[in-house]
Amino acid sequence: MAMNNTSAASACPVADRDDRKSAEFTQKHLSPFAGSKIMRSFSGAREVLRSPNVRQGGSNSSEIVFDNPAHISFFFLDGEPHRKRRASVAAYFTPKAIITRYHPIISRTMAKLTAELQATGAGVLDEMALELASNVTVEILGIDDRNDPRALAKLLHAIRRASPRPNRSALQRFFQDRVFGWYFRAPRARLTKQFYDNHIAPAIEVRRKEPKDDVVSYMIKEGYSKAAMIMECMTYGTAGVSTTREFIGMAAWHMFDRPELKQAFLDADEDGQFAILQEILRLDPVSGVIYRRADSAIPEADDGAIQAGDLVGIDIRAANQDEQTVGACPFAFDAERRTRTRNVANYMTFGDGPHRCPGSQVALHEGRMFLNCVMRVPGVRLAQEPTMLWNPNTQSYEIREMIIHCDKTS
């Protein structure tokens, strides 16, 4: 039975405890889209995300041209076209694919990274996480860039930062697209050309001769245009690399600051390790707000009536910490919480409904294996507190310069 907020607070034995690391930083920088209706309860968020009466409303979705939906990234599609396209990529994210295709890549990468860490006695954890996430992502894409996987990831990040900010006003679009269009488009165009020429085009040449079960092979088979290929690879690349990198950094930060949590993670079995990571993500989700546009009214929505045409923002952090759902002490770390509440352990961290992140399990496996390796390195410790940055395009935090030290091998 759900408890009200008053009883939940009084039931909390550590009412003043707050284990979140990004809450204050996010509150300072997060700027929901103008005119959006924000859903903060877990039930309200789930209701909207699962509703058939909404469609994608963020990430410049209003500026996407749907001349040929078959060649639009499935991230931007809704309804039956989205279901069909999502089914076509489901094989990349099955438990079998994770274990047989990605686990070997993760294991090889971690052996290399930990050997380098011990050889020098120091490393930058967020850069290590970037390399791992990049290696897995290029396998999914079919882009053979493992000689320098971080270069591709950094290029994708630069393209994303050079992109127009989401939900621009009409005046901003007028000046940025028409009056000074050449100025705003030039950096992105240059970087995008570099991405296609140096990464996608070589992969196309290889996959035409030797197709595999990956994104590039699929796009060749379906006759994607150059622009469509760039968009699809950008979507996979930014989602697969950026979020995983930040999640790993945040989880590591929690463990370095709390030795008992680190030890609990190392002592736990696989399921227990996943529970710890999911609870960290509940407290410090990478993404801030995800958006949906209502095609028709939802008059009985939990957080208030929604009218047709409304832009609705899902406050992931607030939903993840809704006492009605997560129980007492919503800001405190508790790996046993999911057992008591009987809710999906990730809550809203990876979204919900038809657009729930398809690669969430891949990210969790990457994070678990990365941290299980790094935290076992003799003498590993945090040498420098990381810097937190804010990405206005994705409305998410970024963790940088997380320097770690360890016992150096002779």
Give the location of each predicted region:
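Cytochrome P450
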Residues: 2-410
